From Swiss-Prot:
Its EC number is 2.1.1.195. Pfam families: CbiD (PF01888). It comes from Thermoplasma volcanium (strain ATCC 51530 / DSM 4299 / JCM 9571 / NBRC 15438 / GSS1). GO terms for molecular function: cobalt-precorrin-5B C1-methyltransferase activity. This is Cobalt-precorrin-5B C(1)-methyltransferase. It is an enzyme of class 2 (transferase). GO terms for biological process: anaerobic cobalamin biosynthetic process; methylation.
Length: 378
């Protein structure tokens, strides 16, 4: 899957993939069309960023006039991904037609989809690991095909429990299968070495329109950063795991100010001096959070619970119970800023904004005049 360069920073020489969420959306749309119109070979699926993607349907079966199933295969492009090539299947039942033409879409997870058992993942414990972003993609795709009919969907992954063992799911608190995720639907090859060269190009291009650059480790951060900062679109850059490379490129391009904006899972690592935040490179999240929380006098028992947490969100919920979450995360943000100044440049301003999954700012360190372009509450 290739995209031509259109000035948006898409690299035409790398293959972009699709997320598990978009793969599930393709299977769900194909299933709905199979029941209503017959066997499908390909479907075109909308994404939250306005791009429509054609996905091959690997299985399309109509059981009867109201039910059937279809499958699509995940493609990860040049991104190193253990789930590349897995099949996501959707069984569906088409029920009554709404008079107002607005289909009601019901989504459930079945075999091969993990169950969330820990706090802090943006999905309530006990629920299937299908993110809100993925659910929205599935609903939008099916609504295009449903023609006003209500549709009941059941998403499954053959051998999903085995595939999940290749991922970080159990470490973060998801058991029994994979997670169906995706903010944009597109999987960018941000963990490859080639992406560092791509970053230099994007960062340099942004300097033509802004003296301030906002570096975002993930698509969720990128989406919310644009709501908080009154800056040109090219001032926002998706950096993946390559924090050090992105900061170095920003300094080489002579930016006056660098903003690190993201979820705590990635940013806490930077506070520990980790500039490649890929899970296989280094961690230190719990140790960093526990150490900073201990500075504010929490009990040994609370420190122990933080150290035993499966994910950053769970650790932060413990800190929140202690009533010091703002102090801890503001300290983390300040520590990141100080580290970047010491390790990269003291002549460049460094600000840090930490958000939760809903985009709320939960920690920050704002350096210099950055407040002038930060739109609080908008």
């Amino acid at each position: 899957m290739m995209y031509a360069s259109d000035g948006s920073g898409v690299n035409p020489f790398q293959q972009y993939g699709i997320t598990t969420g978009l793969t599930a959306a393709a299977a769900a749309k194909a299933c709905t069309l199979t029941v209503l119109k017959g066997v499908q070979n390909r479907v075109v699926v909308p994404t939250p960023i306005g791009i429509r993607i054609e996905v091959k349907v690997v299985e399309s079966v109509r059981i009867d006039e109201s039910s059937g199933y279809a499958s699509a295969e995940k493609f990860s492009g040049d991104n190193p991904d253990q789930l590349n090539g897995i099949t996501i299947r959707c069984h569906c039942k088409v029920v009554k037609k709404q008079e107002n033409g607005r289909s009601k879409i019901t989504i459930s997870g079945n075999a091969g989809i993990g169950v969330v058992e820990k706090d802090g993942l943006g999905i309530r414990p006990g629920e299937k690991a299908i993110s809100q972003g993925a659910r929205k993609m599935i609903e939008d795709a099916v609504r295009e095909a449903a023609g006003g009919y209500d549709v009941e969907l059941s998403i499954s992954v053959p051998n999903g429990e085995e595939f999940a063992k290749l991922t970080m799911n159990e470490k973060v608190g998801v058991f029994g299968g994979i997670s169906v995720l995706g903010t944009t639907g597109i999987e960018e090859p941000v963990s490859t070495e080639e992406y560092e060269l791509h970053l230099k190009y994007i960062v340099a291009a942004g300097r033509c329109v802004s003296k301030i650059i906002v570096l975002c480790p993930g698509n969720t951060a990128l989406k919310f950063a644009k709501k908080y900062f009154a800056l040109p679109d090219k001032a926002f850059v998706l950096i993946g795991d390559k924090v050090g490379a992105a900061v170095s490129a920003s300094i080489e391009s002579a930016y006056d100010h660098v903003v690190i904006f993201g979820l705590p899972g990635k940013l806490v690592k930077i506070a520990a001096g980790i500039y490649n935040t890929h899970s296989k490179v280094a961690d230190g999240r719990m140790e960093t959070l526990a150490a900073v929380a201990a500075m504010y006098g929490i009990s040994k028992g609370a420190v122990k619970r933080i150290m035993e947490s499966s994910n950053t969100g769970e650790a932060i919920s413990i800190i929140e119970q202690e009533g010091i979450v703002a102090e801890v995360l503001n300290t983390i943000a300040s520590r990141i800023s100080n580290r970047l100044k010491a390790d990269f440049s003291r002549s460049v301003g460094f600000s840090v904004v930490i958000i939760d999954h809903d985009g709320k700012i939960i920690g920050s360190h704002l350096d210099g005049h950055i407040k002038e372009v930060l739109k609080y509450g908008k």
